[in-house]
Amino acid sequence: MPPRIIILGAGIIGLSTAVELQQRHQHRSAEPRPSITIVSAELPSQPSEWTEDPRCRPSPDYASMWAGAHYRPIPGATPQLQREAQWAMDTFRRMRRIARDAPEAGVRMMPGIEYLEDSPKEYGRLRTGDRYAGEHDEFRVLDKAELPEGVAWGCRYQTYSLNAPHYSRWLLDRFLAGGGQIVHRKLERLEEAFTLFEDGSQPLVINCTGRNFDQDDKMRIIRGQTVLVRNQFDRTITRQNRDGSWIFLIPRPFAGTIIGGTKEPGDMEVKPRMETRLKLLENCVRAFPEFVDRLEDFDVVLDNVGRRPWRDGGLRLEEERIEDGKTVIHAYGAGGRGYELSWGIAKEVADLVLATERSKFECRVSENLK
């Protein structure tokens, strides 16, 4: 019987991890390839399905379906941010390859522009030609003459933007085409994963649930609301206001542009607020008139509300041994950076999985030689 891996959650971390594990095992011949199963209460779907059948509409807790999503680097000012910066650059490298080799995936390379009304010291140290998003990112600090009124610092670089529901579905299709299995089921506790299959196997469980079944005191919910419009744009722009709020444009390949956004800690409201939509559109007209300069010119498609699973101290990524020799690898709590960090996290999870498998394989060989 091949070893069994169970991945809990079909968000961007779970999907990326599943595909990464499949690809890594293709190059290993000394050990049997594992059976990989994703167990999730919800699965990726397209917005066109949401309008045709409301039952297909994702819940706000399935945050990966409601994401922008683009890559905006954050300088590594703390050990956790330095770790995330490496994951982000690993992801940038992979996304660039996907954009080149699989245009149907919904990932597109484009210019990224940032404007900061305040300039933290970690940004002030950056110089044109530095590596910001990743290798060959054409990073350039903007001259003062290029900055809008009220902006203290700005930059331009090459980044990616993606269509979150489309890309997630593309990943799921790749996983299934590679022999992966799906169990469409909601679990109440992590321990249930070990009894899903009655074949006597001892699965390795990877916890990509986002919130860890609400069993982690460090977890917080941050509500985000954005607006999807049909209006098209050719670059992604982010402006950080002096009060810490943000205004951003995220082109969505095949489907318009995302305008955002909000960060509302502890707010569990699932319905979009119309006053928030109006404020987002007004802010966009004021900050980015080169995109749309009149409210009446917006062609609104959809309001997005997602509840981001944010964790104090950063995402939890570690192996845990629990009773009876059971192994869990945790990878949850990425907050609003799931897509930006996805392939870097998946790579590190896969490293842990392969190390665990290697150890078990060597133990079996040793036992057989006795």
Curated annotation (Swiss-Prot):
EC number: 1.4.3.1
Record keyword Glycoprotein present: yes
Source domain of life: Eukaryota
Keywords on record: FAD, Flavoprotein, Glycoprotein, Oxidoreductase, Signal
Signal sequence extent: 1-18
Effect recorded for F248Y: Increases substrate-binding
Record bears the keyword Signal: yes
Catalytic activity of the protein: D-aspartate + O2 + H2O = oxaloacetate + H2O2 + NH4(+); D-glutamate + O2 + H2O = H2O2 + 2-oxoglutarate + NH4(+)
GO process annotations (BP): D-amino acid catabolic process
CC per GO annotation: peroxisomal matrix
Residues noted as binding FAD in the record, renumbered to the chain: I13, E42, A63, S64, G68, R308, G338, Y339
UniProt-recorded Gene Ontology molecular function terms: D-aspartate oxidase activity; FAD binding
Top EC category: oxidoreductase
Gene3D superfamilies assigned to the protein according to its UniProt record, in alphabetical order: D-Amino Acid Oxidase, subunit A, domain 2, NAD(P)-binding Rossmann-like Domain
Requisite cofactors: FAD
pH-dependence annotation: Optimum pH is 8.
Glycan attachment residues as annotated in the record: N207
Temperature dependence: Optimum temperature is 60 degrees Celsius.
Main function: Selectively catalyzes the oxidative deamination of acidic amino acids. Protects the organism from the toxicity of D-amino acids. Enables the organism to utilize D-amino acids as a source of nutrients.
Family as reported in the entry's similarity comment: Belongs to the DAMOX/DASOX family.
Record's subunit section: Monomer.
Protein name per UniProt: D-aspartate oxidase
Organism taxonomic ancestry: Eukaryota, Fungi, Dikarya, Ascomycota, Pezizomycotina
